Curated annotation (Swiss-Prot):
The lineage of its organism: Eukaryota, Viridiplantae, Streptophyta, Embryophyta, Tracheophyta. Disruption phenotype: No visible phenotype. It comes from the Eukaryota. Inhibited by carbonylcyanide m-chlorophenylhydrazone and 2,4-dinitrophenol. One of its GO terms (cellular component) is nuclear membrane. The chain crosses the membrane at residues 34-54, 58-78, 123-143, 167-187, 188-208, 278-298, 301-321, 325-345, 385-405, 406-426, 442-462. Belongs to the amino acid/polyamine transporter 2 family. Amino acid/auxin permease (AAAP) (TC 2.A.18.2) subfamily. It is found in: Cell membrane; Nucleus membrane; Endomembrane system. This is Amino acid permease 3.
């Protein structure tokens, strides 16, 4: 079916450049640049993960904390560059495009690995949606509580239930989920990227202010001391910290989809490598600053979520602005992550039921003074059901730190390391047991060990949380 489509295109237009309005694959001209791709990546990367980095640094200490962050950033940049080379099969300029991560795996590896990749990728996206729902509710409650504390002068404990805030976030996502394509999200990505800088800067400023108030830099070279936690807890927490940092860098699962929005020439691979370098450098700088400043301010007592753990010090309005920025950012980030999953399910449905009006037909809703709104019934129902499911699970499992660590651990090795390395080896035809092949395999194996350790630490954390937990009764 795809081959027939390409033959028709070859008759209609030159294969090299497409036309004025269409690209070489017959789709509308792509308009993305280094900057829009960087905005998409920054939106996906500087998510709620940044807020757990002070806690992660506290587990690892002044020595290992920054080193681990730098190592993860180097790994992410390296594997993202390998992945960017797999956007086109064959020739990097005119080869067949792979529109999604799964398409790239199908072209380069094939077989059971495609199914495996799909399961891991889409489960990870599903998990990220849950993580972002929890994080947004925590930030909304932080605004409410800080105002409650301010009014009562700290006399009222201001306890509240997280469920209404998760439901509110879910309702907003149902609305935004009706945006049909990833291409149309550029404005939401840029807004979300600006918001991520806003709250990261606020966290950084509050960390610096707290260090000034303390009159010293807290923390130690080896992290949280035995005594404050048991030896076993120290090990589990160190592993969980690795998962938290891995989650803070996880965006490989949507890299190919972002690359598919980029115009050429220059080749999409070159643009994407530049965008990856820009965004990974910017995020690493922010991560180092936020993680280290949070640890310097709080030492062993660094909170799991930096902005909500600041207590409710003045200036309370700055905390409110920062938490509002987190919520706006997470609304955008949720969409940037979930759109590839939405597109995959809708594509599969149209392949399975090509003659179904329910799946294919758009309803035009007239809006006075504007173009009519095109609404697809299947899209409306399935995306709404997806958001409802993620919201309900978030209400069942509101453990921010442990969920973040587990997601990072489960997604990091297969999606950020294993598949990019294997695809690169297949595409460049690197011979088995050559020095290059052995180095890549050792690199992949090392990352697998880190992932297993991080997953174990996070599972231990979830089991600990479950001991004192009542479903749908999360009080903060």
């Amino acid at each position: 079916m795809v081959q027939n489509h390409q033959t028709v295109l070859a008759v209609d237009m030159p294969q090299t450049g497409g036309s004025k309005y269409l690209d070489d694959d017959g789709k509308n001209k792509r308009t993305g640049s280094v900057w829009t791709a960087s905005a998409h990546i920054i939106t996906a990367v500087i998510g709620s993960g940044v807020l757990s980095l002070a806690w992660a640094t506290a587990q690892l200490g002044w020595l290992a904390g920054p080193v681990v962050m730098l190592l993860f950033s180097a790994v992410t940049y390296f594997t993202s560059s390998l992945l960017a080379a797999c956007y086109r099969s064959g020739d990097p300029i005119s080869g067949k495009r792979n529109y999604t991560y799964m398409d790239a795996v199908r072209s380069n590896l094939g077989g059971v690995k495609v199914t495996l990749c799909g399961i891991v990728q889409y489960l990870n996206i599903f998990g990220v949606a849950i993580g972002y729902t929890i994080a947004s509710a925590i930030s909304m409650m932080a605004i409410k509580r800080s105002n409650c504390f301010h009014k009562s002068g700290g006399k009222d404990p201001c306890h509240m239930n997280s469920n209404p805030y998760m439901i509110a976030f879910g309702l907003v996502q149902i609305l935004f989920s009706q945006i049909p394509d990833f291409d149309q999200l550029w404005w939401l990505s840029i807004l979300a990227a600006v918001m991520s800088f806003t709250y990261s800067s606020a966290g950084l400023a509050l960390g610096i202010a707290q260090v000034v108030v303390n009159g010293k830099v807290k923390g130690s070279l080896t992290g949280i001391s035995i005594g404050a936690v048991t030896e076993t807890q120290k090990i589990w927490r160190t592993f969980q910290a690795l998962g938290d940092i891995a989650f803070a860098y996880s965006y490989s699962i949507i890299l190919i989809e972002i690359q598919d929005t980029v115009k050429s020439p220059p080749s999409e691979e070159k643009t994407m490598k530049k965008a990856t370098l820009v965004s990974v450098s910017v995020t690493t700088m922010f991560y180092m600053l936020c993680g280290c400043m949070g640890y310097a301010a709080f030492g062993d007592l660094s909170p799991g979520n930096l902005l909500t753990g600041f207590g409710f010090y003045n200036p309370y309005w700055l905390l409110d602005i920062a938490n509002a920025a987190i919520v706006i950012h997470l609304i955008g980030a949720y969409q940037v992550y979930c759109q590839p999953l939405f597109a995959f399910i809708e594509k599969q449905a149209s392949i399975q039921f090509p003659d179904s009006e329910f799946i294919a037909k758009d309803i035009k809703i007239p809006i006075p003074g504007f173009k009519p709104l095109r609404l697809n019934v299947f899209r409306l129902i399935w995306r709404t059901v997806f958001v409802i499911i993620t919201t309900v699970i978030s209400m069942l499992l509101p453990f921010f730190n442990d969920v973040v660590g587990l997601l990072g651990a489960l997604g990091f090795w297969p999606l950020t390391v294993y598949f990019p390395v294997e695809m690169y080896i297949a595409q460049k035809k690197i011979p088995r047991w050559s020095t290059r092949w052995v180095c890549l395999q050792v690199f992949s194996l090392g990352c697998l060990v880190v992932s297993i350790a991080a997953a174990a630490g996070s599972i231990a954390g979830v089991l600990l949380d479950l001991k004192s937990y009542k479903p749908f009764r999360s009080e903060y």
